[in-house]
Amino acid sequence: MLISQRPTLSEDILTDNRSQFVIEPLEPGFGYTLGNSLRRTLLSSIPGAAVTSIRIDGVLHEFTTVPGVKEDVTEIILNLKGLVVSSEEDEPVTMYLRKQGPGEVTAGDIVPPAGVTLHNPGMRIATLNDKGKIEAELVVERGRGYVPAVQNRALGAEIGRIPVDSIYSPVLKVTYKVDATRVEQRTDFDKLILDVETKSSITPRDALASAGKTLVELFGLARELNVEAEGIEIGPSPAEADHIASFALPIDDLDLTVRSYNCLKREGVHTVGELVSRTESDLLDIRNFGQKSIDEVKVKLHQLGLSLKDSPDSFDPSEVAGYDVTTGTWSTDGAYDSQDYAETEQL
């Protein structure tokens, strides 16, 4: 098995909607392989939402005007293409726009349904004069990439329903470059620098995560041909390496109380790795191993950055009754009696 130097990924946030990501070190050639794949996926395959059709009261087609509105319908539709919207619904949803002049019509005048969010409410859509009035319905759908208006034209659509070009992609721009980087004595490793700019409906971080997930799913098809095929594997991260080292520690190093220690040894639990493979229920099945011992074990494992098999990630030692996180000691009164902790189990 060939084990490669594990790359790290860091993010430099430039603005709310632009970040620069650095992935290094990569095996020679993989900077361009990974950079090109991520760029194309980011630009074409990130799910988003967009307006797909519009109906304006009194308007039959886009080549006309609305009384009292400065812009013609074609310009109004062009402005609506700049609407940044996100939707949690998989089915098409309808938004409503009703405004009477004088004044500007902005995206903030649109009333979206639950599950739909407008991210640029200040965007100008049209301008009304004293007698101007506009009432419209906008259909929003989820999709990927770019879909021309002709493909959004539904068969049997009502008269006056105007299809719109839909730009679903929430990613505006992606560039990348590959520099050389050094690992020990080798200087031919790749350093991938990826610059991602998005719309306000998604962060660059989430967009990159989505692209990564898509590529993993697709490359998984090739892996399924032979799951035992040999390939380059990346080494563990520093945190994972620490965990691996911790798994080999004997439970003696946890400095448990006599009762907890003897109960675990009698059950055949000798290392931290064997301990973290157990659930709370497994431990409670051990004779004389009660909730007090469970709490003690969870606190000790938390100090190593580990937990029992079914412990929630949100475990907080400060919430454990009788434990003082400041001093790292247990209370000697009430529920956590020192005598109860000091005694050994009765065989």
From Swiss-Prot:
InterPro entries: DNA-dir_RNA_pol_insert, DNA-dir_RNA_pol_RpoA/D/Rpb3, DNA-dir_RpoA, RBP11-like, RNAP_asu_C, RNApol_insert_sf. GO terms for cellular component: cytoplasm; DNA-directed RNA polymerase complex. It comes from the Bacteria. It catalyses: RNA(n) + a ribonucleoside 5'-triphosphate = RNA(n+1) + diphosphate. Residues 1-226 are annotated as: Alpha N-terminal domain (alpha-NTD). GO terms for molecular function: DNA binding; DNA-directed RNA polymerase activity; protein dimerization activity. Gene3D superfamilies: 5' to 3' exonuclease, C-terminal subdomain, DNA-directed RNA polymerase, insert domain, RNA polymerase, RBP11-like subunit. Residues 326-347 are annotated as: Disordered. Pfam families: RNA_pol_A_bac (PF01000), RNA_pol_A_CTD (PF03118), RNA_pol_L (PF01193). Residues 243-347 are annotated as: Alpha C-terminal domain (alpha-CTD). One of its GO terms (biological process) is DNA-templated transcription. Homodimer. The RNAP catalytic core consists of 2 alpha, 1 beta, 1 beta' and 1 omega subunit. When a sigma factor is associated with the core the holoenzyme is formed, which can initiate transcription. This is DNA-directed RNA polymerase subunit alpha. The lineage of its organism: Bacteria, Bacillati, Actinomycetota, Actinomycetes, Mycobacteriales. The gene is rpoA.
